[in-house]
């Protein structure tokens, strides 16, 4: 109130007082997000002595959020494995489903972390987008940075920027198209936040259900998610040094 933090909730306001309200947008967005259906058992896609991959359902956050009561894959996985250590090296957006990889011992962290930071692994996604893709394949390349918060939920938004951005490279291949939609495969050569979502929307092909980047609200209301799925990952194994997909 009048430039000072108010500590007494019962204090009376005087006429002409200036009131500034602080809003925690992260907590607000988390509270407004739909509550996901929590699976009884997480599906394990791959497991050996060093690595384990889970199939993350859409709607389930990768890790704990500001809403401590909201379920997340990391905590569910720990519980399912009986408290075994899990090293988290990447994440998927809440509404993105698919492959999520963890290390099972700390001694494998450096080897795996370097592959992520140096972009030495390949991550493949399937996306359903609005519109008919004209080119059967191509490469999308730009520098991505934050554009601030957008929409009624004040979600963090990213896009191509002229300065201060990080290089992002996405290859795509058209799999099928019809009824005003296209099914495509995307391969990431970098791992920037919202990279595929931004690159496709900037080409005029927003992911179906992705209201933050241009998909009509009716699609999200109908589907309850955006149509992006991480279907494969190729990584060099920390023990055998062979490629594992």
Task: Walk through the language-model features, giving the residues of each.
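RNA pseudouridine synthases
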Residues: 1-245
């Amino acid at each position: 109130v009048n430039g000072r933090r108010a500590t007494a909730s019962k204090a009376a306001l005087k006429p002409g007082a200036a009131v500034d309200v602080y809003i925690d947008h992260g907590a607000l967005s988390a509270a407004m997000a739909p509550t996901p259906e929590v699976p009884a058992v997480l599906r394990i896609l791959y497991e050996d002595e060093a690595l384990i991959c889970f199939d993350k359902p859409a709607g389930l956050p990768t890790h704990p959020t500001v809403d401590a009561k909201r379920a997340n894959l990391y905590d569910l996985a720990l519980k399912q494995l009986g408290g075994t250590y899990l090293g988290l090296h990447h994440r998927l957006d809440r509404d993105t489903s698919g492959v999520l990889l963890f290390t099972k011992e700390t001694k494998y962290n450096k080897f795996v972390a370097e592959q992520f930071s140096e972009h030495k692994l390949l991550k493949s996604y399937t996306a359903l987008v609005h519109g008919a893709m004209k080119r059967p394949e191509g490469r999308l390349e730009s520098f991505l940075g934050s554009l601030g918060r957008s929409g009624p939920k004040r979600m963090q938004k990213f896009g191509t920027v002229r300065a201060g951005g990080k290089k992002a490279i996405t290859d795509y291949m058209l799999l099928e198209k019809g009824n005003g939609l296209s099914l495509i495969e995307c391969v990431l050569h970098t791992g920037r936040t919202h990279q595929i979502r931004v690159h496709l929307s900037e080409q005029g092909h927003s992911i179906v259900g992705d209201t933050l980047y241009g998909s009509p609200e009716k699609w999200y209301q109908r589907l309850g998610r955006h149509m992006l799925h991480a279907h494969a990952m190729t990584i060099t194994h920390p023990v055998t040094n062979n490629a594992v997909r």
